[in-house]
């Protein structure tokens, strides 16, 4: 979800959902904003308790998201930042993180909020971090999307294996 045309769903009661947030540690200022946005969404959706787990970097998000999924959480939100440098490393990390998180979602039938910023520079990340003056709040958006997806799956009678 990005910029113009993004949905603005009204928060629904998700107090019955078990939620875990896994967050990378690189780019502290941006990560603090993403985590704060996720926590605002959890409050808006009436999720009283959640688990926050920190990992070193974005690459580690998928394996920890999978471990949390196996602990019977209804929702996992993954937050991280990858900023393009001068080597192909950016492309490999972004692809691996995306594919890993999609695998967790599909293999576990579990909503995984994708709050991983893949940016060309620091300013793009700051603009999306939900900080004062930011244009977007991707931590909030990723959490909201995952919660709404979990609610939809519950309404469909779908449960994780």
From Swiss-Prot:
Binding site for (2S)-2-hydroxy-3-oxobutyl phosphate: 86-87, 128
This enzyme's EC code(s): 2.5.1.78
Location of the active site: 89 (proton donor)
Keyword list, A-Z: Riboflavin biosynthesis, Transferase
GO molecular-function term, one example from the UniProt record: 6,7-dimethyl-8-ribityllumazine synthase activity
UniProt enzyme class: transferase
Pathway noted in the entry: Cofactor biosynthesis; riboflavin biosynthesis; riboflavin from 2-hydroxy-3-oxobutyl phosphate and 5-amino-6-(D-ribitylamino)uracil: step 1/2
Cellular component terms per the entry's GO annotation: cytosol; riboflavin synthase complex
GO biological process: riboflavin biosynthetic process
Annotated catalysed reactions: (2S)-2-hydroxy-3-oxobutyl phosphate + 5-amino-6-(D-ribitylamino)uracil = 6,7-dimethyl-8-(1-D-ribityl)lumazine + phosphate + 2 H2O + H(+)
Binding site for 5-amino-6-(D-ribitylamino)uracil: 26, 58-60, 81-83, 114
Xref: InterPro entries: LS, LS/RS, LS/RS_sf
Annotated family: Belongs to the DMRL synthase family.
Function: Catalyzes the formation of 6,7-dimethyl-8-ribityllumazine by condensation of 5-amino-6-(D-ribitylamino)uracil with 3,4-dihydroxy-2-butanone 4-phosphate. This is the penultimate step in the biosynthesis of riboflavin.
Protein name: 6,7-dimethyl-8-ribityllumazine synthase
Lineage: Bacteria, Bacillati, Actinomycetota, Actinomycetes, Propionibacteriales
């Amino acid at each position: 979800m990005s910029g113009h045309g993004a949905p603005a769903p009204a928060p629904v009661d998700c107090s019955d959902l078990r939620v875990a947030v896994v967050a990378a540690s690189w780019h502290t200022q941006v990560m603090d904003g993403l985590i704060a946005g996720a926590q605002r969404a959890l409050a808006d959706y009436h999720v009283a308790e959640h688990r926050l787990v920190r990992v070193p970097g974005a690459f580690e998000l998928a394996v920890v998201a999978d471990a949390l999924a196996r602990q019977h959480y209804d929702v996992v939100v993954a937050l991280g930042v990858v900023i393009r440098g001068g080597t192909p490393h950016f492309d490999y990390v972004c692809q691996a993180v995306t594919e890993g998180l999609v695998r967790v979602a599909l293999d576990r039938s579990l909503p995984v909020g994708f709050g991983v910023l893949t940016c060309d520079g620091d300013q793009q990340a700051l603009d999306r971090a939900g900080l004062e003056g930011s244009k977007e709040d991707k931590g909030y958006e990723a959490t909201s999307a995952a919660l709404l997806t979990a609610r939809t799956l519950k309404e469909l009678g779908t449960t994780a294996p």
